[in-house]
Protein backbone atom coordinates (compact mmCIF):
# COMPACT_ATOMS: atom_id res chain seq x y z
CA UNK A 1 0.00 0.00 0.00
CA UNK A 2 1.30 3.45 -1.00
CA UNK A 3 -0.27 6.61 0.42
CA UNK A 4 -0.08 10.01 -1.29
CA UNK A 5 -0.87 13.06 0.83
CA UNK A 6 -1.65 16.63 -0.23
CA UNK A 7 -1.76 19.09 2.66
CA UNK A 8 -3.27 21.61 2.82
CA UNK A 9 -5.89 21.89 0.10
CA UNK A 10 -5.28 25.44 -1.11
CA UNK A 11 -7.61 28.32 -1.98
CA UNK A 12 -10.52 27.13 0.13
CA UNK A 13 -11.99 28.57 3.32
CA UNK A 14 -10.49 26.33 5.98
CA UNK A 15 -7.97 23.56 6.29
CA UNK A 16 -8.16 20.06 4.80
CA UNK A 17 -5.93 17.45 3.24
CA UNK A 18 -6.26 14.76 0.57
CA UNK A 19 -4.88 11.25 0.85
CA UNK A 20 -4.78 8.82 -2.07
CA UNK A 21 -4.21 5.16 -1.24
CA UNK A 22 -2.63 3.01 -3.97
CA UNK A 23 -2.38 -0.77 -4.06
CA UNK A 24 0.96 -2.48 -4.66
CA UNK A 25 0.39 -2.33 -8.43
CA UNK A 26 -0.02 1.46 -8.32
CA UNK A 27 -3.78 1.56 -8.89
CA UNK A 28 -6.02 3.90 -6.88
CA UNK A 29 -7.67 1.98 -4.08
CA UNK A 30 -9.22 4.79 -2.05
CA UNK A 31 -9.26 8.60 -1.91
CA UNK A 32 -10.15 10.57 1.20
CA UNK A 33 -10.82 14.19 2.05
CA UNK A 34 -9.78 14.84 5.66
CA UNK A 35 -11.18 17.80 7.59
CA UNK A 36 -9.25 18.31 10.81
CA UNK A 37 -11.11 21.26 12.28
CA UNK A 38 -13.76 20.92 14.96
CA UNK A 39 -16.50 23.31 16.07
CA UNK A 40 -18.78 23.05 19.06
CA UNK A 41 -21.34 25.78 18.43
CA UNK A 42 -24.31 23.50 19.09
CA UNK A 43 -22.96 22.97 22.60
CA UNK A 44 -22.22 26.69 23.05
CA UNK A 45 -25.90 27.45 22.46
CA UNK A 46 -27.30 25.16 25.14
CA UNK A 47 -28.62 27.11 28.10
CA UNK A 48 -28.68 30.43 26.24
CA UNK A 49 -31.90 32.43 25.70
CA UNK A 50 -33.34 31.51 22.32
CA UNK A 51 -33.35 35.13 21.09
CA UNK A 52 -29.55 35.29 21.52
CA UNK A 53 -28.94 32.60 18.89
CA UNK A 54 -28.95 34.94 15.85
CA UNK A 55 -26.23 37.03 17.53
CA UNK A 56 -24.07 34.03 18.48
CA UNK A 57 -24.10 31.80 15.40
CA UNK A 58 -22.71 34.32 12.87
CA UNK A 59 -19.36 33.75 14.59
CA UNK A 60 -19.34 30.28 13.05
CA UNK A 61 -18.03 31.88 9.88
CA UNK A 62 -16.87 35.22 8.55
CA UNK A 63 -18.04 34.48 4.99
CA UNK A 64 -21.51 32.94 5.39
CA UNK A 65 -22.23 34.74 8.65
CA UNK A 66 -25.36 36.38 7.27
CA UNK A 67 -26.91 33.04 6.40
CA UNK A 68 -26.23 31.62 9.87
CA UNK A 69 -27.80 34.78 11.29
CA UNK A 70 -30.89 34.46 9.09
CA UNK A 71 -31.36 30.70 9.53
CA UNK A 72 -31.15 31.23 13.28
CA UNK A 73 -33.57 34.16 13.06
CA UNK A 74 -36.10 32.01 11.20
CA UNK A 75 -35.75 29.26 13.81
CA UNK A 76 -36.28 31.87 16.55
CA UNK A 77 -39.30 33.23 14.65
CA UNK A 78 -40.79 29.73 14.80
CA UNK A 79 -40.15 29.50 18.55
CA UNK A 80 -42.15 32.72 18.94
CA UNK A 81 -44.97 31.37 16.77
CA UNK A 82 -44.12 33.27 13.57
CA UNK A 83 -44.27 31.56 10.20
CA UNK A 84 -42.05 33.17 7.51
CA UNK A 85 -45.09 34.87 5.98
CA UNK A 86 -45.95 36.35 9.40
CA UNK A 87 -42.76 38.43 9.49
CA UNK A 88 -43.62 42.06 8.77
CA UNK A 89 -43.22 42.74 5.01
CA UNK A 90 -40.64 45.53 5.35
CA UNK A 91 -38.58 43.42 7.77
CA UNK A 92 -38.84 40.40 5.47
CA UNK A 93 -37.55 42.45 2.55
CA UNK A 94 -34.70 43.90 4.63
CA UNK A 95 -33.62 40.39 5.56
CA UNK A 96 -33.67 39.44 1.88
CA UNK A 97 -31.52 42.44 0.94
CA UNK A 98 -29.03 41.43 3.63
CA UNK A 99 -28.96 37.91 2.18
CA UNK A 100 -28.49 39.06 -1.42
CA UNK A 101 -25.69 41.40 -0.35
CA UNK A 102 -23.92 38.56 1.41
CA UNK A 103 -24.31 36.35 -1.66
CA UNK A 104 -22.66 38.94 -3.89
CA UNK A 105 -19.80 39.30 -1.42
CA UNK A 106 -19.27 35.54 -1.13
CA UNK A 107 -19.74 34.64 -4.81
CA UNK A 108 -17.43 37.48 -5.82
CA UNK A 109 -14.80 36.30 -3.36
CA UNK A 110 -14.96 32.74 -4.61
CA UNK A 111 -14.77 33.44 -8.33
CA UNK A 112 -12.13 36.14 -8.39
CA UNK A 113 -9.90 35.08 -5.50
CA UNK A 114 -10.26 31.30 -5.23
CA UNK A 115 -11.48 29.83 -8.53
CA UNK A 116 -10.29 32.20 -11.26
CA UNK A 117 -6.55 31.55 -10.76
CA UNK A 118 -7.08 28.01 -12.08
CA UNK A 119 -8.42 29.42 -15.34
CA UNK A 120 -6.67 32.78 -15.69
CA UNK A 121 -3.31 32.68 -13.89
CA UNK A 122 -1.76 29.73 -15.73
CA UNK A 123 -0.71 26.22 -14.77
CA UNK A 124 2.47 27.05 -12.85
CA UNK A 125 1.95 26.53 -9.13
CA UNK A 126 3.92 29.68 -8.29
CA UNK A 127 1.66 31.94 -10.38
CA UNK A 128 -1.64 30.15 -9.81
CA UNK A 129 -3.00 32.67 -7.33
CA UNK A 130 -4.84 35.95 -7.03
CA UNK A 131 -1.60 37.94 -6.82
CA UNK A 132 -0.79 36.95 -10.39
CA UNK A 133 -4.24 38.15 -11.48
CA UNK A 134 -3.61 41.49 -9.75
CA UNK A 135 -0.28 41.74 -11.57
CA UNK A 136 -1.52 40.68 -15.01
CA UNK A 137 -5.03 42.17 -14.95
CA UNK A 138 -5.35 44.93 -12.32
CA UNK A 139 -8.64 46.12 -13.83
CA UNK A 140 -10.21 42.73 -13.11
CA UNK A 141 -8.91 42.83 -9.55
CA UNK A 142 -10.34 46.31 -8.99
CA UNK A 143 -13.67 45.15 -10.43
CA UNK A 144 -13.76 42.31 -7.90
CA UNK A 145 -12.98 44.63 -5.00
CA UNK A 146 -15.66 47.15 -6.02
CA UNK A 147 -18.30 44.43 -6.36
CA UNK A 148 -17.57 43.03 -2.91
CA UNK A 149 -17.38 46.49 -1.31
CA UNK A 150 -20.79 47.43 -2.68
CA UNK A 151 -22.22 44.13 -1.48
CA UNK A 152 -20.93 44.62 2.05
CA UNK A 153 -22.55 48.05 2.21
CA UNK A 154 -25.91 46.33 1.72
CA UNK A 155 -25.09 43.97 4.58
CA UNK A 156 -23.88 46.82 6.80
CA UNK A 157 -27.06 48.85 6.32
CA UNK A 158 -29.49 45.97 6.88
CA UNK A 159 -27.50 43.80 9.28
CA UNK A 160 -26.16 46.55 11.52
CA UNK A 161 -22.54 45.74 10.70
CA UNK A 162 -20.69 44.38 7.64
CA UNK A 163 -19.58 41.15 9.34
CA UNK A 164 -21.47 39.08 11.94
CA UNK A 165 -24.85 40.88 11.70
CA UNK A 166 -27.06 41.38 14.74
CA UNK A 167 -30.22 43.04 13.43
CA UNK A 168 -32.82 40.26 13.06
CA UNK A 169 -35.24 40.07 15.98
CA UNK A 170 -38.16 37.68 16.63
CA UNK A 171 -40.60 38.37 13.82
CA UNK A 172 -38.78 41.46 12.57
CA UNK A 173 -35.58 43.46 12.23
CA UNK A 174 -34.05 46.37 14.14
CA UNK A 175 -32.45 48.37 11.31
CA UNK A 176 -34.01 51.23 9.34
CA UNK A 177 -33.02 52.83 6.04
CA UNK A 178 -33.49 56.57 5.60
CA UNK A 179 -34.22 57.86 2.09
CA UNK A 180 -30.65 58.95 1.41
CA UNK A 181 -29.19 55.61 2.50
CA UNK A 182 -31.72 53.67 0.45
CA UNK A 183 -30.93 55.70 -2.67
CA UNK A 184 -27.20 55.16 -2.15
CA UNK A 185 -27.68 51.41 -1.70
CA UNK A 186 -29.82 51.32 -4.84
CA UNK A 187 -26.97 52.85 -6.84
CA UNK A 188 -24.57 50.27 -5.42
CA UNK A 189 -26.91 47.41 -6.26
CA UNK A 190 -27.41 48.74 -9.80
CA UNK A 191 -23.66 49.06 -10.18
CA UNK A 192 -23.30 45.44 -9.06
CA UNK A 193 -25.72 44.41 -11.80
CA UNK A 194 -23.24 45.91 -14.26
CA UNK A 195 -20.29 44.26 -12.52
CA UNK A 196 -22.03 40.89 -12.42
CA UNK A 197 -22.74 41.12 -16.15
CA UNK A 198 -19.09 42.02 -16.75
CA UNK A 199 -18.03 39.01 -14.68
CA UNK A 200 -20.17 36.69 -16.81
CA UNK A 201 -18.77 38.27 -19.97
CA UNK A 202 -15.29 37.51 -18.66
CA UNK A 203 -15.98 34.03 -17.36
CA UNK A 204 -18.30 32.35 -19.87
CA UNK A 205 -15.76 32.35 -22.75
CA UNK A 206 -13.18 30.89 -20.35
CA UNK A 207 -15.58 28.13 -19.34
CA UNK A 208 -16.36 27.45 -23.00
CA UNK A 209 -12.66 27.23 -23.84
CA UNK A 210 -12.29 24.63 -21.09
CA UNK A 211 -15.46 22.69 -21.92
CA UNK A 212 -13.60 19.38 -22.27
CA UNK A 213 -12.33 19.75 -18.73
CA UNK A 214 -15.79 20.84 -17.56
CA UNK A 215 -17.30 17.70 -19.09
CA UNK A 216 -14.75 15.33 -17.58
CA UNK A 217 -13.19 16.52 -14.31
CA UNK A 218 -14.54 14.86 -11.19
CA UNK A 219 -18.08 14.51 -12.51
CA UNK A 220 -20.52 12.34 -10.59
CA UNK A 221 -24.27 11.80 -10.73
CA UNK A 222 -26.21 12.60 -7.58
CA UNK A 223 -29.53 13.92 -6.35
CA UNK A 224 -29.79 17.72 -6.04
CA UNK A 225 -31.54 19.73 -3.33
CA UNK A 226 -32.50 23.38 -2.88
CA UNK A 227 -35.19 25.84 -1.84
CA UNK A 228 -37.86 26.96 -4.28
CA UNK A 229 -40.84 29.26 -3.79
CA UNK A 230 -43.72 28.32 -6.08
CA UNK A 231 -41.08 26.61 -8.21
CA UNK A 232 -38.99 29.79 -8.49
CA UNK A 233 -35.33 30.11 -7.39
CA UNK A 234 -35.22 31.56 -3.88
CA UNK A 235 -32.42 31.79 -1.33
CA UNK A 236 -34.35 32.99 1.74
CA UNK A 237 -37.58 31.03 1.98
CA UNK A 238 -39.66 28.29 0.41
CA UNK A 239 -39.94 24.52 0.43
CA UNK A 240 -37.08 22.09 -0.02
CA UNK A 241 -37.17 20.35 -3.40
CA UNK A 242 -35.17 17.22 -4.25
CA UNK A 243 -34.61 15.97 -7.79
CA UNK A 244 -33.15 12.57 -8.61
CA UNK A 245 -30.11 11.75 -10.74
CA UNK A 246 -32.10 12.11 -13.96
CA UNK A 247 -33.72 15.40 -12.97
CA UNK A 248 -37.11 13.96 -12.03
CA UNK A 249 -39.00 15.26 -9.03
CA UNK A 250 -38.19 13.07 -6.03
CA UNK A 251 -39.65 14.92 -3.08
CA UNK A 252 -40.66 18.28 -1.65
CA UNK A 253 -40.89 18.94 2.07
CA UNK A 254 -41.32 21.77 4.54
CA UNK A 255 -38.18 22.91 6.38
CA UNK A 256 -39.49 21.63 9.72
CA UNK A 257 -39.60 18.10 8.27
CA UNK A 258 -35.93 17.92 7.23
CA UNK A 259 -35.07 15.19 9.77
CA UNK A 260 -37.59 12.84 8.16
CA UNK A 261 -35.61 12.93 4.91
CA UNK A 262 -31.93 13.43 5.78
CA UNK A 263 -29.66 11.06 7.74
CA UNK A 264 -25.91 11.13 8.43
CA UNK A 265 -23.14 8.57 7.93
CA UNK A 266 -19.90 8.76 9.94
CA UNK A 267 -16.35 7.94 8.85
CA UNK A 268 -13.46 7.79 11.34
CA UNK A 269 -10.97 10.00 9.48
CA UNK A 270 -13.00 13.24 9.24
CA UNK A 271 -14.82 15.54 11.64
CA UNK A 272 -17.41 16.09 8.91
CA UNK A 273 -20.36 13.72 8.65
CA UNK A 274 -21.62 12.26 5.37
CA UNK A 275 -25.34 13.09 4.90
CA UNK A 276 -27.63 11.13 2.59
CA UNK A 277 -31.32 10.74 1.76
CA UNK A 278 -32.65 8.44 4.45
CA UNK A 279 -34.93 6.34 2.22
CA UNK A 280 -32.10 5.52 -0.20
CA UNK A 281 -29.29 4.69 2.23
CA UNK A 282 -25.59 5.47 1.93
CA UNK A 283 -24.04 5.97 -0.64
CA UNK A 284 -27.04 5.65 -3.01
CA UNK A 285 -28.70 8.60 -1.31
CA UNK A 286 -25.80 11.04 -1.68
CA UNK A 287 -27.08 14.46 -2.74
CA UNK A 288 -25.63 17.88 -3.40
CA UNK A 289 -26.57 21.42 -2.33
CA UNK A 290 -24.98 24.27 -4.26
CA UNK A 291 -25.54 27.04 -6.81
CA UNK A 292 -25.78 24.32 -9.46
CA UNK A 293 -28.28 22.39 -7.34
CA UNK A 294 -30.43 25.50 -6.93
CA UNK A 295 -30.53 26.02 -10.69
CA UNK A 296 -31.25 22.34 -11.22
CA UNK A 297 -34.29 22.26 -8.92
CA UNK A 298 -35.74 25.66 -9.94
CA UNK A 299 -38.21 26.15 -12.78
CA UNK A 300 -37.09 29.73 -13.38
CA UNK A 301 -35.39 32.76 -11.85
CA UNK A 302 -37.42 35.51 -10.11
CA UNK A 303 -39.30 38.09 -12.18
CA UNK A 304 -37.09 40.72 -10.52
CA UNK A 305 -34.05 39.16 -12.25
CA UNK A 306 -34.78 39.15 -16.01
CA UNK A 307 -31.12 39.25 -17.03
CA UNK A 308 -30.30 36.30 -14.81
CA UNK A 309 -33.32 34.51 -16.28
CA UNK A 310 -31.84 34.87 -19.77
CA UNK A 311 -28.57 33.35 -18.59
CA UNK A 312 -30.49 30.62 -16.75
CA UNK A 313 -32.46 29.79 -19.89
CA UNK A 314 -29.30 29.56 -21.99
CA UNK A 315 -27.57 27.48 -19.32
CA UNK A 316 -30.51 25.06 -19.17
CA UNK A 317 -30.62 24.79 -22.97
CA UNK A 318 -26.90 24.01 -23.13
CA UNK A 319 -26.56 21.62 -20.20
CA UNK A 320 -30.03 20.47 -19.20
CA UNK A 321 -30.06 18.89 -15.76
CA UNK A 322 -26.37 19.50 -15.12
CA UNK A 323 -24.13 17.18 -13.11
CA UNK A 324 -20.72 18.61 -14.15
CA UNK A 325 -18.82 19.75 -11.08
CA UNK A 326 -17.01 22.67 -12.73
CA UNK A 327 -20.36 24.12 -13.82
CA UNK A 328 -20.73 25.23 -10.20
CA UNK A 329 -18.65 28.26 -11.20
CA UNK A 330 -21.00 29.20 -14.04
CA UNK A 331 -24.10 28.69 -11.89
CA UNK A 332 -22.55 30.79 -9.13
CA UNK A 333 -22.15 33.75 -11.48
CA UNK A 334 -25.75 33.49 -12.70
CA UNK A 335 -26.75 33.73 -9.05
CA UNK A 336 -24.42 36.69 -8.58
CA UNK A 337 -26.36 38.55 -11.26
CA UNK A 338 -29.73 37.43 -9.86
CA UNK A 339 -28.87 38.72 -6.38
CA UNK A 340 -27.78 42.09 -7.73
CA UNK A 341 -30.99 42.42 -9.76
CA UNK A 342 -33.21 41.33 -6.85
CA UNK A 343 -31.49 43.74 -4.46
CA UNK A 344 -31.87 46.63 -6.89
CA UNK A 345 -35.54 45.81 -7.40
CA UNK A 346 -36.20 45.67 -3.65
CA UNK A 347 -34.36 48.94 -3.01
CA UNK A 348 -36.57 50.68 -5.57
CA UNK A 349 -39.59 49.76 -3.44
CA UNK A 350 -41.04 51.05 -0.19
CA UNK A 351 -39.11 49.80 2.86
CA UNK A 352 -40.60 52.22 5.37
CA UNK A 353 -43.18 49.93 6.98
CA UNK A 354 -43.21 48.55 10.52
CA UNK A 355 -40.34 46.18 11.21
CA UNK A 356 -41.02 44.96 14.75
CA UNK A 357 -44.12 43.09 16.04
CA UNK A 358 -46.36 44.78 18.60
CA UNK A 359 -46.17 41.81 20.97
CA UNK A 360 -44.05 38.70 21.46
CA UNK A 361 -44.82 35.43 23.21
CA UNK A 362 -42.09 32.85 23.58
CA UNK A 363 -43.20 29.22 23.21
CA UNK A 364 -41.56 26.02 24.42
CA UNK A 365 -40.82 23.57 21.64
CA UNK A 366 -38.89 23.39 18.39
CA UNK A 367 -38.01 25.95 15.76
CA UNK A 368 -36.42 25.16 12.40
CA UNK A 369 -34.99 27.77 10.06
CA UNK A 370 -33.71 26.98 6.58
CA UNK A 371 -32.08 29.37 4.13
CA UNK A 372 -29.84 28.86 1.13
CA UNK A 373 -26.27 29.80 2.03
CA UNK A 374 -23.98 30.56 -0.93
CA UNK A 375 -22.65 27.00 -0.68
CA UNK A 376 -26.06 25.35 -0.31
CA UNK A 377 -28.94 24.62 2.03
CA UNK A 378 -28.35 25.61 5.67
CA UNK A 379 -30.52 24.38 8.55
CA UNK A 380 -30.72 25.62 12.14
CA UNK A 381 -32.92 23.61 14.52
CA UNK A 382 -33.39 24.69 18.13
CA UNK A 383 -35.39 23.21 20.99
CA UNK A 384 -36.21 25.52 23.89
CA UNK A 385 -37.90 25.03 27.26
CA UNK A 386 -40.71 26.99 28.92
CA UNK A 387 -38.17 29.60 30.06
CA UNK A 388 -37.00 30.21 26.50
CA UNK A 389 -33.61 28.57 27.07
CA UNK A 390 -32.09 26.41 24.34
CA UNK A 391 -31.92 22.76 25.40
CA UNK A 392 -30.77 21.34 22.07
CA UNK A 393 -29.34 22.75 18.85
CA UNK A 394 -28.57 21.13 15.51
CA UNK A 395 -26.86 22.99 12.68
CA UNK A 396 -26.56 21.32 9.27
CA UNK A 397 -24.28 23.34 7.02
CA UNK A 398 -23.92 23.09 3.26
CA UNK A 399 -20.34 21.83 3.24
CA UNK A 400 -21.31 18.85 5.41
CA UNK A 401 -23.99 17.93 2.89
CA UNK A 402 -21.53 18.24 0.00
CA UNK A 403 -18.84 16.25 1.81
CA UNK A 404 -19.73 12.85 0.28
CA UNK A 405 -19.86 14.31 -3.24
CA UNK A 406 -16.53 16.10 -2.85
CA UNK A 407 -14.87 12.87 -1.80
CA UNK A 408 -16.49 10.96 -4.67
CA UNK A 409 -15.29 13.65 -7.08
CA UNK A 410 -11.64 13.53 -6.02
CA UNK A 411 -11.80 9.73 -6.10
CA UNK A 412 -12.82 9.93 -9.75
CA UNK A 413 -9.98 12.35 -10.57
CA UNK A 414 -7.48 10.08 -8.84
CA UNK A 415 -8.72 7.06 -10.78
CA UNK A 416 -8.64 8.97 -14.08
CA UNK A 417 -5.16 10.46 -13.71
CA UNK A 418 -3.13 8.27 -11.35
CA UNK A 419 -2.03 5.11 -13.15
CA UNK A 420 0.79 2.60 -12.61
CA UNK A 421 4.04 4.14 -13.81
CA UNK A 422 2.64 7.69 -13.93
CA UNK A 423 4.53 10.17 -11.76
CA UNK A 424 2.15 11.91 -9.39
CA UNK A 425 2.93 15.62 -9.24
CA UNK A 426 1.38 18.90 -8.18
CA UNK A 427 -0.61 19.20 -11.41
CA UNK A 428 -2.60 16.04 -10.66
CA UNK A 429 -3.29 17.12 -7.10
CA UNK A 430 -4.36 20.56 -8.31
CA UNK A 431 -7.00 18.86 -10.46
CA UNK A 432 -8.35 17.29 -7.27
CA UNK A 433 -8.22 20.67 -5.58
CA UNK A 434 -10.14 22.19 -8.50
CA UNK A 435 -12.97 19.75 -7.82
CA UNK A 436 -13.03 20.69 -4.14
CA UNK A 437 -12.82 24.42 -4.93
CA UNK A 438 -15.83 24.16 -7.22
CA UNK A 439 -17.95 23.35 -4.17
CA UNK A 440 -16.50 26.41 -2.37
CA UNK A 441 -16.30 24.48 0.92
CA UNK A 442 -16.32 26.51 4.11
CA UNK A 443 -14.31 24.45 6.61
CA UNK A 444 -13.25 27.12 9.04
CA UNK A 445 -15.04 29.73 11.11
CA UNK A 446 -14.15 33.19 12.33
CA UNK A 447 -13.12 31.93 15.77
CA UNK A 448 -10.50 29.46 14.53
CA UNK A 449 -7.05 30.10 13.05
CA UNK A 450 -4.47 27.91 11.37
CA UNK A 451 -0.77 28.17 12.10
CA UNK A 452 0.84 30.03 9.20
CA UNK A 453 3.42 27.28 8.73
CA UNK A 454 0.62 24.89 7.79
CA UNK A 455 -0.19 27.05 4.78
CA UNK A 456 2.86 25.75 2.91
CA UNK A 457 1.55 23.11 0.50
CA UNK A 458 3.35 19.77 0.51
CA UNK A 459 2.87 16.55 -1.42
CA UNK A 460 4.13 13.47 0.43
CA UNK A 461 4.65 9.96 -0.97
CA UNK A 462 4.84 6.99 1.42
CA UNK A 463 5.92 3.44 0.58
CA UNK A 464 4.09 0.23 1.50
CA UNK A 465 5.84 0.19 4.89
CA UNK A 466 4.53 3.64 5.71
CA UNK A 467 7.90 5.33 5.33
CA UNK A 468 8.19 8.74 3.68
CA UNK A 469 9.71 8.35 0.21
CA UNK A 470 9.44 11.83 -1.25
CA UNK A 471 8.17 15.28 -0.30
CA UNK A 472 7.33 17.83 -3.02
From Swiss-Prot:
Q: What is its EC number?
A: 1.12.99.-
Q: What is this protein called?
A: F420-non-reducing hydrogenase subunit A
Q: Which residues bind Ni(2+)?
A: 61, 64, 442, 445
Its source organism is Methanothermobacter thermautotrophicus (strain ATCC 29096 / DSM 1053 / JCM 10044 / NBRC 100330 / Delta H)
Subunit and interaction comment: The F420-non-reducing hydrogenase is composed of three subunits; MvhA, MvhD and MvhG. It forms a complex with the heterodisulfide reductase (hdr).
Kindly indicate whether the keyword Protease belongs to this entry: no
Record's keyword terms, sorted: Metal-binding, Nickel, Oxidoreductase
State any single GO MF term: nickel cation binding
Described purpose of this protein according to its UniProt entry: Part of a complex that provides reducing equivalents for heterodisulfide reductase.
Pfam family example for this protein? NiFeSe_Hases
Task: Report the SUPFAM superfamilies cross-referenced here.
Answer: HydB/Nqo4-like
Q: Which family is this protein grouped under?
A: Belongs to the [NiFe]/[NiFeSe] hydrogenase large subunit family.
Q: Which PROSITE patterns match?
A: NI_HGENASE_L_1, NI_HGENASE_L_2
Cofactor dependency: Ni(2+)
Amino acid sequence: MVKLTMEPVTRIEGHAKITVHLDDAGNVEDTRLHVMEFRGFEKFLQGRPIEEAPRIVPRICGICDVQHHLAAAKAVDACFGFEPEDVLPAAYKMREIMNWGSYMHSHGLHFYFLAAPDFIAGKDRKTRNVFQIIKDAPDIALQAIELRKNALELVRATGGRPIHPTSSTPGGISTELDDETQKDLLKKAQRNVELAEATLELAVPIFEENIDLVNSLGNIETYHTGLVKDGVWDVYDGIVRIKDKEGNMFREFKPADYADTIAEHVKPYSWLKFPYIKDLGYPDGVYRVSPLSRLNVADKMPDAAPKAQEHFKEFRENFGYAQQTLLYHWARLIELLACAECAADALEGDLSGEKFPDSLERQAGDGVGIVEAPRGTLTHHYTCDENGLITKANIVVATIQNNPAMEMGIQKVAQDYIKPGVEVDDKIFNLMEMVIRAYDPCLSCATHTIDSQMRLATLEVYDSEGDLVKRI
